[in-house]
Amino acid sequence: MGRECEITGKRTMFGNNVPRKGLAKKKGGAGQHIGVKTKRTFKVNLINKKFFIPELGKNVSIKISASTLRSISKVGLNVFLKKNNKKIDDFI
């Protein structure tokens, strides 16, 4: 599957590095000047996490992003999977 969250589908995104120099006009300067834009990647913070499923009596290993882990810890795995139209059977 590569670098992708198995629940939310978050994956690597692409963008630009934008170097800025100079003091902002608001702070009394001549204004910020933007240099040459260069391409960069924004990678997902992925974690291999094991969850215990009491209904099945098994541990399930899922590759998820850190933000997904925070959401799961707030609402619970079953609620979060239902919200994202996934089932536990997809990960067994």
UniProtKB/Swiss-Prot annotation:
Q: What is one process in the GO biological process aspect for this record?
A: translation
The reply to whether Ribosomal protein figures as a keyword in the UniProt entry is: yes
Q: Which Pfam families match?
A: Ribosomal_L28
Q: Does the keyword Transferase apply?
A: no
Q: Which InterPro entries match?
A: Ribosomal_bL28, Ribosomal_bL28/bL31-like_sf, Ribosomal_bL28_bact-type, Ribosomal_bL28_sf
Q: From the record, what ranges are coiled-coil? A: none
- What does the entry list under GO cellular component? ribonucleoprotein complex; ribosome
Question: PANTHER family per the record?
Answer: 39S RIBOSOMAL PROTEIN L28, MITOCHONDRIAL (PTHR13528), LARGE RIBOSOMAL SUBUNIT PROTEIN BL28M (PTHR13528:SF2)
UniProt similarity note: Belongs to the bacterial ribosomal protein bL28 family.
Q: NCBIfam families this protein is in? A: L28 (TIGR00009)
Q: What is this protein called?
A: Large ribosomal subunit protein bL28
Organism of origin: Borrelia duttonii (strain Ly)
Give the source lineage, highest ranks first. Bacteria, Pseudomonadati, Spirochaetota, Spirochaetia, Spirochaetales
Identify the coding gene: rpmB
